[in-house]
Amino acid sequence: MEAVSTLARHIRDEMGKVVVGQEDLKTECLLTLLCQGHALLEGVPGLAKPLAIKTLSRLLGLEFQRVQCTSDLMPADIIGTNVMHLADSTFRLHRGPVFTHLLLVDEINRMPPRTQAALLECMEERQVTIDGARHELSSFFTVFATQNPIDFEGTYQLPEAQLDRFLVKIRVGYPGADEEVRLLSTVHSGFDAHDLDAADLRPVAPDLLVSARKEARSVTVQESLITYVVQLARRTRQWPALSLGASPRAAVSLMRVAQALAAIDGRTYVVPDDVKQAMLPVLRHRVIVRPEADLEGMDADQILLDVIRAVEVPR
C-alpha cells in the first residue's frame, strides 16, 4: 500500500499549510478520490470547504472548476452548448465547467431540478449529452458539492436519486478553540486564502493517484466481512426509526470505502473497524429518518450508531 500511504501522508501534510484542522474533511475527500466517487460537503458558510477542494486540486495537479448555484442556473450553464459561428455557419461545442477534473458545485441545494438532472448524468455516467451527442468526461471527474444546512433560507432538500450518487456526505463542523486560534494567527501573519502560490504547496507525481486507486481496489475483503456489510445494510431497512434504509448500491459503497480506509492505514485487508468508520459518511445521506423519530431529536448519525451496536461483529 505504498502509493496510498504516500499520497495520504502528503495530502494531509500539504493541506495543513492552508486548511487548519478539519482532519475528517481531508481524509474523506481523499477517500472520495480513491474510490472514484463524489462527495457532498455540508456545513455553514465560512468553514473553508471551497478552499479545501481548490487546494486538493493544486496538490494533485488536476484541473479545477467552480459552479455557484442559483435558482436560475440552466443545464447549459454547467454542461455547455453548441454555438453557431457566423463566419462559416457551423456549430461548435462550447464546453461547460463539467469538462474538468475536480468540479466544485457550491450550494447545490439552490440548484433547480432540471439542472440537477443534467448534473446527475455527469456524476453517474461520467458523460454529458448535448443536442443528442454524447461527450465523455475525464476518468478523474469528481464532483465536490457543498450545501448549507437545510434550515437556511432559500434552500431545499436534494431528491433521493441525487443523494444516492454521492459516495460520502462529509459534515464540516466548526474548528476547535485551539485550531481557531491557529487559524487567526496564520491570517495575522499574512496568509491569504486567495493566493495559494504563496503557500508553497508541493504537488504529487501525476500518476500517484492512479496507482493509489489500483492499490485501494486490491484490498482483500473476507467473506465474513462482506456478510457483515450486508447485515448492516439490511438492518437499516428494518430499523423502526428509518423510513428508508440503505440500498444495495450503498452497501457496495460501504465496502469500497472500507477498502480505501484499510489501504490508508497500510493494510492489505479490511477489518471490522474499517466498516464501522465508513458507516456514517457513506450512509448518513442515504437513509431517511421517520418524522416521529426526528421530533424526538434523533438524527441519521445517532440511528446508524445504534445499528452498528445491534449487529454482531465477525470474529
Located regions from the model:
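Conserved beta-strand position immediately N-terminal to the Walker
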Residues: 39, 103, 141
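P-loop (Walker A) phosphate-binding loop of NTP-binding proteins
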Residues: 44, 78, 146
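Walker A/P-loop
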Residues: 33-70
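Canonical AAA+ ATPase core
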Residues: 85-90, 111, 123-219, 259-264
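Conserved alpha-helical scaffold flanking the Walker A/P-loop in AAA+ ATPase domains
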Residues: 28-31, 84-104
